[in-house]
Amino acid sequence: MKRYMSAIAILVVVTILLTVTVGVAGDGNKPIVPKKKTMLWNGKDFMGWKMFLRDRAADVAKTWSVANGLVRCTGKPAGYMRTENDYADYLFHVEWRWPEKAGNNGVLVHMSGEDKVWPRSLECQLHSGNAGDFWVIDGIEIAEHAKGGPRVKGRRTIKLKDSSEKPLGQWNAYDIVCKDDWIVVFVNGVLQNVGTKCSDTSGKICLQSEGAVIEYRNIYIEPLE
């Protein structure tokens, strides 16, 4: 029943966003708007993804690996794996867990510009206990952060509710809805944050490497209609 209600909540938000019409600024690139559910990670290798690490001399294969149908990231050195393509107007789904200890990580959406640590993007936080927070990076902006208030701490916009994460070692689910200049995030089906009037409306999607061992699975993108 809880899983069913979570799906209903996400569907309701998507339906509302589809009724919102706003102007979308482009940068000359043609982002992909998904027409069907697409697995972004094929479960076998990193086809369709590019790895970037702060230490250019580091071996990416020692940071990112595939085992037992999972993506495993050591968290060191800092960096990310990102999609080769840009995307717009989608629901992004990823599942993650901390197999050893609690740590820091995140999903970057609307990533653009040069590969660096950290690139222009909006981070949807995965830091233990804080999944659902937003962080603005390298000039990107959302209205909720720009206006300030009790939820804003530096570049961070704190999530709306208490943590909805599962205990350490268990799998969590992130659903990130991007529609025009809105970004809406659900953690295990619980609505945790809403960003509006985002300065960027498309870009690449990144999974961070940021200090602790983390595992990912079931990474896909879906259309909003």
Description of each model-found segment:
Residues 1-11:
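Bacterial N-terminal signal peptides that target proteins for export
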Residues 9-19:
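Bacterial N-terminal signal peptides
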